[in-house]
From Swiss-Prot:
Subcellular location: Secreted
Entry's Gene Ontology cellular component terms: extracellular region
Keyword hit for 4Fe-4S: no
Similarity comment: family membership: Belongs to the FARP (FMRF amide related peptide) family.
Name the UniProt record assigns to this protein: Extended FMRFamide-3
Organism: Namaquaphasma ookiepense (Gladiator bug)
Key words of the record: Amidation, Neuropeptide, Secreted
Primary site of residence: secreted
Leucine amide, modified sites: L9
Role according to the record: FMRFamides and FMRFamide-like peptides are neuropeptides.
GO biological process: neuropeptide signaling pathway
Coiled-coil boundaries: none
Length: 9
């Protein structure tokens, strides 16, 4: 979803 990049910390 839109938070995918953030979750890939």
């Amino acid at each position: 979803g839109p938070d995918s990049a953030f979750l890939r910390l």
